[in-house]
Amino acid sequence: MEQHVIMALTVLIVVPVIFTIFAKKPSLIPTPIQNVFEIYIEFIDNLIKENMGEKGRKYFPLIASIGLFVFFGNLLGIIPGLESPTANLNTTMALALLVFFIYNFEGIRENGIGYFKHFLGPVPAMAPVFVIIELLSHLSRPVTLALRLFANMTGGELISVVLIMLVPFLIPMPVMLIHLIAVFLQTYVFVVLTTVYIAGAITHAEH
């Protein structure tokens, strides 16, 4: 089994266990880890409410889970000798396709056949043109979502390795800090885009 698969499975198994432990036994005096999880939960909750309102709450487990997987998957790349699963195109493409199929499925489930009306555009005479544009736009989403995460994580790991090999005693900490910033940023981008895509799909009938 390839390392990126092992790392992905590790994240899928370990993170839910840790999250469940802290969710079931919250301390009266919050620990630093508990504070971090609470901040994350509040962030996801606010993001969903801003984009989908109260009806978007049912997507909280999905979006929060994707965010946790991406974050901890990215984070593994900081540890020497470990390969981040998100630095492998197979992983990021699988994630992106998951998001793609989910938001389209939810769009159809919420709006029925009306979901496809937005592909026709606002001007009936221009419908053939809008269909092509909308299809290309939607089909490009999983590709750009996957490539963005893959390229940033792969690039970050390669730069870290090269710099650490060149100047092993002076570079590691600054490089790790930069990589950590990239971990947070790419997780944020992936989660926000996932939320926006789902929101756009389920609210088309309202516009």
Curated annotation (Swiss-Prot):
Question: What InterPro entries does this protein's entry cite?
Answer: ATP_syn_F0_a_bact/chloroplast (IPR045082), ATP_synth_F0_asu (IPR000568), ATP_synth_F0_asu_AS (IPR023011), F0_ATP_A_sf (IPR035908)
The Swiss-Prot or TrEMBL record describes its family as follows: Belongs to the ATPase A chain family.
Q: Which NCBIfam families match?
A: ATP_synt_6_or_A (TIGR01131)
Provide the protein's localization. Answer: Cell inner membrane
| Any one GO molecular function term | proton-transporting ATP synthase activity, rotational mechanism
Source organism: Sulfurihydrogenibium sp. (strain YO3AOP1)
Q: What is this protein called?
A: ATP synthase subunit a
Note one Pfam family from the annotation.
Answer: ATP-synt_A
